[in-house]
């Protein structure tokens, strides 16, 4: 959202109590959104309705109350969803007939961060016109509607049940998990109630970890960013597999029956292969610049079209829409199954993997036998007084990059990525031989380091 004063591409996020992540600003934000929605409704006589969901971090109580007060003061009704995965809020916004949805979450970040993300009535990112109107409304003083036009707030008590039924509807009616022992790591986050309940209803024996949030333990040593915890529990309990979500439930990673971690690249391979066999796969599978070269090679062997987008689930989504595809994802566990959900949904994605395993009569480990990952490593080269763009475009760096790409041609990849958030250039090399990979990485990163000095 270039040129915006307050918002980035995915709402706002930061340290609680600093900048826009404050109760004062969020109160004004709720009021501004309420006024925009009231104006959009015009004279039809119905108050706009906004649903609010959150993850489990302690500051969510403060921001939920602030948003509620601001919206109600502007004349909008509010339905409080309580702790709810981000994709669930998108689904509920789309299906409850409301005007907008809000998620209070900082995803996989620590508890001391938080953020605000918006959904349109269609459960998608707000359009440019609404975003611009919201920015403009924030520069207008707080407004309280006349008493008879004030909004009301209520709890959406059927929200959990509706979302669970949606998740169940994403798998065949006859599918169940009877006889399956699985470990669920909910990151002490937004999936802590829904995920164990859902998988038990499907018949699984569920061993739960990371399902006791206290407001400050979200993502702390648990969840998809700490997969070793899940792996150890799988080995300890002799489970068939483990599933780990992140704090807001839009990412999923797994561990096989031996406790080996299974990342988003692995899960993408399992789904693509299964969906091709089922005739469900359409268009290209979309990965990112960071997807392992072994995945690309495996897809080529299977004659599955594969394209790469920039890093970030929104770019994966964009590439899928443009290419008419239905399956994409990144190693971090953001998976998009667009024939089942409009956004990345950790629970729905996990269910699709379990269906693929059941249909193929395979364990997680067996389903990965056709995939040979190659060694991959990234080095961050910190910049001096030279910009990232100038560093990457330097003749010496371009020559070193061309030489690196030639040395791993047909065996891997070498590429550079200027960071968008810090003064570094990321140097990545992968190859089917670890020594070749390391030597190539050393030469290329040295050239970048010299140009950046």
Curated annotation (Swiss-Prot):
It catalyses: alpha-D-glucosamine 1-phosphate = D-glucosamine 6-phosphate. The active site is at residue 107. The modification Phosphoserine is found at residue 107. Signal peptide: none annotated. One of its GO terms (biological process) is carbohydrate metabolic process. Keywords: Isomerase, Magnesium, Metal-binding, Phosphoprotein. One of its GO terms (cellular component) is cytosol. Belongs to the phosphohexose mutase family. Catalyzes the conversion of glucosamine-6-phosphate to glucosamine-1-phosphate. This is Phosphoglucosamine mutase. The lineage of its organism: Bacteria, Pseudomonadati, Pseudomonadota, Gammaproteobacteria, Lysobacterales.
